[in-house]
Design a protein with these regions (language model features):
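A detector for small-residue-rich transmembrane helices and their helix-helix packing motifs
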Residues: 1-246
């Protein structure tokens, strides 16, 4: 299933989502402008290398400096290829505006970064000796998906399912689409631990950590109905679609 439309209407322009997408794209364009050696140095400095933190925790004196903390944030603005970037930004573009609309711009930015950091910590915890740099916005975006499922479990997501090269379009409930995605992350994460406990090519546990953070945190910071408006879990009330048509 590939999502192509989020049917929940929004009221305000998603300024922070636009900024996040632009920042990720600019960072990626900078990445591909580098030589292979320069790119390797960039990734080992600003992407997330779990073994680095295991060494810090194993030392007698834990005294983290800015170079140790920075990758927890910067890793979520780096990507490993065009497809990696496009899939992440597409998902953020579909679901980010809805959550930004409900949280407000400043809260949404803090929420997004927090989910990204929790995702980084989860990846370190489950892959403590990995020397493979982890990078990508998917952990933070997983937090957006978790919050979307929490706030609008009965919202409809339009997805396309290609069967024998024929695209079929369906409307599914958010709890089904996002829940299925989360279940796949858990299964893949468990399989990864069982098969390759010292190496993680995909940061499954970062996705899981970000999702759980988003699902748990969003009720605490969502705007009250007095500041926004009353809204429903599906937003499909009174027989109107998001454009106001019957």
């Amino acid at each position: 299933m590939f999502p192509i439309r989020n049917t929940v209407p929004t009221r305000y322009p998603p300024v922070i989502t636009w900024v996040l997408i632009a920042t990720n794209c600019i960072a990626f364009l900078f990445e591909i402008s580098l030589s292979p050696y320069e790119l390797e140095q960039l990734l080992y400095q600003f992407a997330l290398v779990p073994a680095r933190y295991s060494e810090i925790l194993a030392s007698d004196e834990i005294n983290p400096v800015i170079d140790d903390v920075l990758p927890l944030f910067t890793m979520m603005f780096l990507h490993g290829g065009w497809l990696h970037l496009i899939l992440n930004m597409w998902t953020l573009w579909l679901f980010g505006p809805t959550i930004e609309d409900r949280l407000g711009h400043s809260r949404y930015l803090a929420f997004y970064l927090t989910c990204g950091v929790v995702a980084s910590v989860a990846h370190i915890f489950f892959n403590p000796v990995s020397i493979v740099p982890a990078l990508g916005a998917s952990g933070a975006i997983a937090g957006v998906l978790g919050s979307y499922m929490r706030l609008f479990p009965l919202a409809r997501v339009v997805v396309v399912v290609p069967i024998l090269f024929i695209p079929l379009f369906f409307e599914v409930y958010a709890f089904f689409y996002v829940g299925f995605w989360f279940l796949m992350q858990v299964l893949q994460g468990m399989l990864d631990l069982a098969v390759t406990p010292t190496r993680a090519d995909v940061a499954w546990w970062a996705h899981i950590g970000g999702f759980v953070a988003g699902f748990a945190l969003v009720p605490l910071i969502v705007q009250s109905e007095r500041r926004y408006r009353a809204y429903y879990r599906d937003e499909g009330v009174l027989g109107f679609d998001p454009e106001g048509r019957m």
